[in-house]
Amino acid sequence: MNINFRYFTPDDRAEFFRMVKKFYAPPAVLHFPSDEVMLSSFDAALDMPELVKGIMIESDGNPAGYAIVSMKFETEVGGMAAWIEELYVDDDYRSKGIGSKFFAFLADELQGKIKRIRLEVGDENGGAKKLYERLGFEFLDYKQMVIDKDF
């Protein structure tokens, strides 16, 4: 199995939309966004690649998943951090090492540019949690708060 990672192109929109709908299927998320909101991350990755990185994951040339990574400054580490907004791998490609290869790709791409990789994982996602812990991720004790509205 040949795994390839590449940045989004406009031609990826339909395939991204197919996969992002699966990513946001309950019970994996707390809130199910509209189609427009789901596609906004794809558009942001094309429009603002310095802040939002859209990455297609391919296996032997076939779409196998995608990732959305946001770049932000974090005072705690005194530098830039990559926030894994979404990391999705289709069912047929899970447990084949793609997650580990993705993080190796990301580390190579962002070497010397970031000081932290940050992500969220739900309690129900035991497989992902094991992967992240094996890669050295640790839980933070923070409880996050948000306010959603158009400012």
Protein language model regions, located:
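A short beta-loop-alpha structural element at the N-terminal edge
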Residues: 4-16
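Conserved GNAT-fold acetyl-CoA-binding loop/helix
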Residues: 24-43
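Conserved beta-strand in the GNAT
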Residues: 56, 62-71
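Glycine-rich acyl-CoA binding loop
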Residues: 57, 95-100
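Conserved active-site alpha-helix within GNAT-family acetyltransferase domains
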Residues: 100, 104, 123-141
